[in-house]
Regions:
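Non-catalytic alpha/beta scaffold blocks inside enzyme catalytic domains
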Residues: 331, 335-508
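Cofactor-/ligand-binding subdomain signature composed of acidic, glycine-rich
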Residues: 135, 245-310, 352-353, 357-365, ...
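Gly/Ser/Thr-rich loops at beta-strand to alpha-helix junctions
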Residues: 313-324, 400-402
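Glycine-rich phosphate/diphosphate-binding loops that line cofactor/substrate pockets in enzymes
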Residues: 299-313, 382-392
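Long, low-complexity segments enriched in small/aliphatic residues
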Residues: 496-526
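N-terminal cofactor/phosphate-binding cores enriched in small/glycine residues
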Residues: 6, 11-76, 85-90
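Fe-S ferredoxin-like electron-transfer domains
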Residues: 50-233, 238-242, 250
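Phosphate/diphosphate-binding loops
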Residues: 198-256, 398-400, 407-424, 459-475
Length: 526
């Protein structure tokens, strides 16, 4: 497809399009109902289902012919008619065949509310939708295709999206089409193959009719009954765009949010379980001082006292949001300190997992908390400073220092202060521990590995009212330390406004309305 703009006629109206653009994309862009279950922008086109048939002609003087909207491309002067009678009749006949094979168990189907068959019937007011398949057996017989994937052949419409995903995206031949006893083609695994890779659950999202099921969601609320909130995965610096699906302050699942610049329409299986990480680990929910619960003011005063010494070490990583890092930078400018910025390594897969297991290292570099050269792999240098008496205070921001080289046996005069989400060894050893919100309980931004600024939104509330965002705690610490009566940066709006006024790269960015696809900061960086 090239960038030449052309004129075409769509259902009697003159519209603009790009030369070589798929007809189905033009039709959908103009909000004209047309089902194309086998078509996906990120997969090779095939025309398997035949439900996107439309009438088209090269010139007004030509006769209409029936074409597949998912494979046919736009040419200057072309006329398209989605209501061309011959095309409509063929679409309806093919749709009727799909319904004859499809079970009417919509109330139990995990795709309810998002099923292409239901949507097509509703849009076209297809007659007899609830009667055609009345005698179809209702027993669900799942095939196990992998550790997390179940397959219900009775719901399969033969679109072959799953086959093309494995071939086009995973570059593997895992699924194929075989004949069954009813004379229909049926999806099945190749001998010796299984869907146990880290991207297999994308088939559940891809399937338009609910044939693929995530076995973990079999007995959970269906998607249409959940609230969907845009977010960003913290699994790695890729910054996969996601939707967090929740209800009643509980997260039930995470699914991919399409962004052609970052993750296309896909995500890893491991990123879908990020909310379980916080559920399965002990959460820090109380403000603690020497093992006793205390008011926030008391804990802040204890931490501020540590700012008076030049023997203070700050431990952090790219797990913090851009807002956290911005206010932290203001705090660090006021105190004498040594910063140990940790690199969190992981094994990259060459696709949606990078070698950096944190979402916002570039944000720390932008806020001048660290540089690429100063990032450390462990805390051996900090351990040496502790042993030689050069470090008497450690301020850890959501970091488990004992898993990065610091011995648990420490001098009696060493004091640890912890601000984070987990009730771990560091928080238990700390003189003061203050809980903060997770990415699911907060609104903010990350800068991914490609310097794309991306926004995440608050989905659920923290466990109690005494848990605040990390940037808010930093703002309070700054106010207490500077002993100012007028507290600043206590609202997210104030933080965003300060960022645009202080950081040149962010000067023209409206944080209140960040594009869902993000903003590429490389265009701003010199």
């Amino acid at each position: 497809m090239n960038n030449n703009r052309i004129n075409i006629i769509l259902n009697g109206k003159n519209v603009k399009a790009q030369e070589g653009e798929r007809l189905v994309e033009i039709i959908q862009r103009h909000n004209i109902p047309l089902s194309a279950p086998c078509y996906h922008r990120s997969l090779t086109e095939t025309g398997h289902c035949g439900l996107c048939l439309v009438g088209a002609r090269r010139k007004v003087t030509d006769k209409f012919s029936v074409v597949f909207a998912c494979t046919a491309t736009a040419k200057d002067g072309m006329e398209i008619d989605t209501e061309y009678k011959e095309a409509v009749d063929k679409r309806n006949e093919l749709f009727r065949l799909h319904l004859l094979r499809h079970p009417l168990d919509c109330s139990k189907c995990n795709k309810v509310g998002y099923c292409f068959l239901h949507k097509f019937a509703s849009q076209t007011r297809f007659p007899g939708f609830t009667r055609i398949a009345k005698d179809h057996p209702q027993d669900i017989k799942y095939k196990k295709f992998g550790q997390h994937i179940l397959f219900d052949a009775t719901k399969c419409i033969g679109c072959q999206r799953c086959i093309r995903f494995c071939r086009d995206v995973l570059d593997e031949e895992l699924l194929g089409l075989i004949g069954n006893e009813n004379g229909y083609g049926e999806i099945d695994l190749y001998p010796g193959k299984s869907l146990d890779n880290n991207y297999s659950l994308n088939l559940v999202d891809l399937c338009p009719a609910g044939a693929f099921v995530n076995r973990n969601y079999l007995y959970q609320p269906v998607e249409w009954n959940l609230i969907s909130t845009p977010s960003i995965s913290t699994e790695s610096s890729v910054g996969i765009n996601t939707y967090v699906l929740h209800k009643g302050n509980k997260i039930f699942r995470i699914k991919p949010r399409e962004n052609k610049y970052v993750n296309d329409a896909w995500m890893t299986n491991s990123a879908r379980n990020e909310h379980r990480y916080f559920e399965n680990r002990k959460r820090l929910t109380k403000i603690m001082q020497n093992g006793q619960q205390v008011p926030l003011e008391s804990a802040l005063l204890q931490i501020v006292e540590s700012f008076q010494t030049n023997e203070l070490a700050v431990v952090c990583s790219g797990n913090m949001s851009l807002e956290d890092q911005f206010v932290l930078r203001k705090l660090l400018d006021s105190i004498i300190h040594n910063v140990f910025f940790l690199r969190k390594k992981m094994t990259p897969d060459g696709f949606l997992i990078s070698d950096d297991a944190t979402p916002n290292v570039n944000g720390a570099i932008l806020n001048k908390i660290t540089t690429q050269e100063k990032i450390v792999d462990d805390l051996k240098e900090l351990t040496e400073k502790i042993q030689t008496g050069q470090c008497k205070r450690i301020l850890s921001f959501n970091e488990e220092i004992f898993s990065h080289g610091v011995p648990y046996a420490l001098p009696d005069d060493l004091k640890i202060f912890y601000i984070g989400t987990e009730n771990n060894k560091t928080s238990k050893r700390a003189m003061v521990a203050i809980p903060v919100t997770t990415v699911f309980e907060n609104t903010g931004t990350f800068i991914n590995r490609d310097w794309r600024l991306q926004k995440f939104h608050k989905a659920v509330n923290p466990p109690n009212g005494n848990i605040f965002p990390m940037w808010y705690i930093f703002s309070l610490l700054l106010s207490v330390y500077l002993d100012v009566s007028k507290k600043e940066l206590l609202w997210l709006d104030d933080v965003w406004k300060n960022m645009t006024h202080t950081v040149d790269v962010l000067a023209d960015i409206d944080f209140f309305h960040v594009n869902p696809g993000g903003i590429l900061l490389k265009n701003y960086l010199k």
